[in-house]
């Protein structure tokens, strides 16, 4: 069996990735595909934690722009991530991958509350852990959640899976055909160039805690496994 480069990873999924071509909601075929890819990685013995966004259902920023109270809009976004997390848990357990959902906002009838040491214990037992409801606080993105949880559980890398791009480019490759893809970057370069991979709070957390980030496309089957095994795909961001 081919060995993995990493022992413990955080997989960051955007909510949009779960909607597939329909652009909204949850596409069962996408859930099946992602679940299969996560299983491939778990079967290598890698400990997998997942943070999923909620943009396929609701974005707090959009609600705020509509005139809603920003905190209320963000809490709605957190609830959307829980819906996505439960769908992904179901997809994983359908193919016999033992999975736990932990939420930053307590709802014990639905999932476990987030407890760092319990999450680590689940990972050590080779269960997949899905962190839902963001950080539990408004004004913080799920990218920041991924960075925070990665630091807390001492993950070796954050795998940022994208559904519409295969790495980080100098410009939007859909609008600018001459845009070049970066193979590697530092966090400072990413921030200074305004590349918009993740927000500055998340970037600073990763940089300060020396957590590398790999941005890649999830649309090609097997890509998560390839990244975990050390293949050079996408863009790697690290250090200062």
UniProtKB/Swiss-Prot annotation:
Keywords of the record: Allosteric enzyme, ATP-binding, Cytoplasm, Kinase, Nucleotide-binding, Pyrimidine biosynthesis, Transferase
GO molecular function list: ATP binding; UMP kinase activity
Keyword Repressor appears in the UniProt entry: no
Chain spans, region Involved in allosteric activation by GTP: 20-25
Pathway where this protein functions: Pyrimidine metabolism; CTP biosynthesis via de novo pathway; UDP from UMP (UMPK route): step 1/1
GO BP of this protein: 'de novo' CTP biosynthetic process; UDP biosynthetic process
Chief subcellular location: cytoplasm
Binding site for ATP: 12-15, 55, 59, 163, 169, 172
Class of this enzyme: transferase
Keyword Aminoacyl-tRNA synthetase found: no
Function: Catalyzes the reversible phosphorylation of UMP to UDP.
Family stated for the protein in its record: Belongs to the UMP kinase family.
Subunit text: Homohexamer.
Protein name listed in UniProt: Uridylate kinase
């Amino acid at each position: 069996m081919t060995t993995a480069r990493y022992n413990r990873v955080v997989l960051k999924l955007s909510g949009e990735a779960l909607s597939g071509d329909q652009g909204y909601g949850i596409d069962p075929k996408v859930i099946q595909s992602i679940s299969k890819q996560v299983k491939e990685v778990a079967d290598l013995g890698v400990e997998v934690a997942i943070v999923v966004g909620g943009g396929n259902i609701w974005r707090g920023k959009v609600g705020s722009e509509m005139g809603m109270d920003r905190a209320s809009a963000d809490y709605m976004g957190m609830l959307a991530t829980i819906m996505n997390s439960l769908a992904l848990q179901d997809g994983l357990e359908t193919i016999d991958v033992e999975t736990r959902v932990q939420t930053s906002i307590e709802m014990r009838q639905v999932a476990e509350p987030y407890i760092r040491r319990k999450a680590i214990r689940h990972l050590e037992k080779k269960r997949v852990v899905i962190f839902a409801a963001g950080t539990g606080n408004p004004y913080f993105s799920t990218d920041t959640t991924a960075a925070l949880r990665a630091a807390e559980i001492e993950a070796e890398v954050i795998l940022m899976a994208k559904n519409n791009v295969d790495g980080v480019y100098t410009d939007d490759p859909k609008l600018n055909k001459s845009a070049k893809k970066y193979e590697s970057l530092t966090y400072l370069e990413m921030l200074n160039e305004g590349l918009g991979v993740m927000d500055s709070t998340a970037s600073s957390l990763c940089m300060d805690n020396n957590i590398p980030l790999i941005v890649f496309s999830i649309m090609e089957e097997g890509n998560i496994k390839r990244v975990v095994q050390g293949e050079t795909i996408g863009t790697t961001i690290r250090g200062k």
